[in-house]
Amino acid sequence: MASLHPPSFAYMRDGRNLSLAESVPAEIMHMVDPYWYQWPPLEPMWFGIIGFVIAILGTMSLAGNFIVMYIFTSSKGLRTPSNMFVVNLAFSDFMMMFTMFPPVVLNGFYGTWIMGPFLCELYGMFGSLFGCVSIWSMTLIAYDRYCVIVKGMARKPLTATAAVLRLMVVWTICGAWALMPLFGWNRYVPEGNMTACGTDYFAKDWWNRSYIIVYSLWVYLTPLLTIIFSYWHIMKAVAAHEKAMREQAKKMNVASLRNSEADKSKAIEIKLAKVALTTISLWFFAWTPYTIINYAGIFESMHLSPLSTICGSVFAKANAVCNPIVYGLSHPKYKQVLREKMPCLACGKDDLTSDSRTQATAEISESQA
């Protein structure tokens, strides 16, 4: 992320060097942080590469998340309270790419932000809102897996009403955080190569810097700690279960107890937890660079280049592509329904054999009720 070489001004206008900030239209010049005046415009090649990558990622994300929403809402066996979190995740990922990638591609074609100050703020707000909702949807999924696997029968079953209330809280709080920069706590500004907008992480006053810090605590650190807590206890529960199974098998003088129905149910729950853990791990690796960029900006600890900042933004948006792929490859019941409804898109071996599908469906529905 740090720039290893100082910028070299290769672009000239009226006999003087042209900076990156001077490439934007006059109507949004006041929104550009002075930091960007030290950089020349990017080579046109980079706009083409970034636009192409975003277009591919956006198309894949829109198609993949639409399919996830369709499969989970159209299949009765998948319409469970727990899977409402999955559908919400797919919806927020879909909306993030729906609102993010067309402007980046369009502005990349012109080499700068051409959509005016209002749409810049709207773009930044949508990115903040849908990114926050996606992160907290994955947090709810992780905590739900914790309740199912660790607490087991001792837990209070999740109802549809409880799931809806949790999602309403997430949308309300994330919406409030996304709106705050529009009312004076920080602001949304052009960033990187000037084809996208985000929070102002180069603000010099601590009032605006505090927004980045507090927001990151809500949208990054708190979810991360919740996820670590959930999966730490899940791994402990799985290890304890495996140890108990081995000891019981030794007492019964048999090789394995894997044929028991209780163990089949536990295996399904563990597989679903692995799917969620994979999804969340991908989110962590996608959003961590962008978080580092924000902190590097407010604490002035790195000399950030336009290319590094826009790549961090693109990397974060790429997470919206990963989730439908993970569920398509790993979620047993999802794969089964996808194979039935869209056989041309099904991939991999069906984890549920014809003799066990009815039982597995009941187990999944029952465990997520």
From Swiss-Prot:
Any one GO molecular-function label of the UniProt entry: G protein-coupled photoreceptor activity
Membrane disposition: Multi-pass membrane protein
Side Cytoplasmic, residues: 72-83, 144-162, 239-274, 331-369
Any GO CC annotation of this UniProt entry: membrane
Protein modification: Phosphorylated on some or all of the serine and threonine residues present in the C-terminal region.
Broad class of where this protein is predominantly found: membrane
Chain ranges passing through the membrane: 47-71, 84-109, 124-143, 163-186, 211-238, 275-298, 306-330
Tissue expression per record: Each Drosophila eye is composed of 800 facets or ommatidia. Each ommatidium contains 8 photoreceptor cells (R1-R8), the R1 to R6 cells are outer cells, while R7 and R8 are inner cells. Rh6 is expressed in a subset of R8 cells, most likely expressed in the subset of R8 cells paired with Rh4-expressing R7 cells (R7y).
Protein location: Membrane
Pfam families given in the database record: 7tm_1 (PF00001)
UniProt modified residues of type N6-(retinylidene)lysine: K317
Disulfide bonds: C120-C197
Role description: Visual pigments are the light-absorbing molecules that mediate vision. They consist of an apoprotein, opsin, covalently linked to cis-retinal.
Protein name: Opsin Rh6
Organism: Drosophila melanogaster
